[in-house]
């Protein structure tokens, strides 16, 4: 089966995750959801190269030691099957910038489940703890 290859990363600081509130793009399947940062592979990229690029593009931050946490496969009609490579990171440098896809906010880990997140994300948040 062919999968759309993507990455997702949760940066961690002071008991919080950096969350992206997707409110800026029109026709966004994630509109008004809170998600981590990440995106689709570009040609020739592997998961690590993709997540490094996406985090820098969306946040202005450069990860120094991302931790590969696993793979999550999504099957949800009408979208193509997606293979998401999940990362967390506690070591990063730089100054956070505005994101063209939404608003970035540090959210206490215990409050994330109360946000409008995808139902499937709730499963792996429990596993990340």
Q: Across the structure, where does each feature detected by a protein language model lie?
A:
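Conserved N-terminal beta-strand and adjoining loop/helix that marks the start
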Residues: 1-19, 40-41
């Amino acid at each position: 089966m062919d999968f759309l290859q993507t990455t997702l990363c949760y940066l961690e600081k002071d008991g919080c995750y950096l969350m992206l509130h997707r409110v800026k793009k029109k026709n966004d399947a994630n509109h008004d959801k809170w998600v981590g940062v990440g995106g689709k592979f570009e040609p020739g990229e592997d998961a690590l190269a993709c997540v490094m690029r996406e985090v820098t593009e969306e946040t202005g931050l450069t990860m120094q030691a991302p931790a590969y946490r696993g793979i999550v496969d999504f099957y949800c009609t009408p979208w193509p099957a997606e293979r998401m490579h999940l990362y967390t990171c506690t070591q990063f440098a730089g100054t956070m910038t505005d994101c063209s896809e939404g608003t970035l906010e540090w959210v206490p880990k215990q409050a994330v489940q109360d946000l409008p997140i995808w139902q499937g994300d709730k499963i792996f948040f429990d596993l990340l703890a």
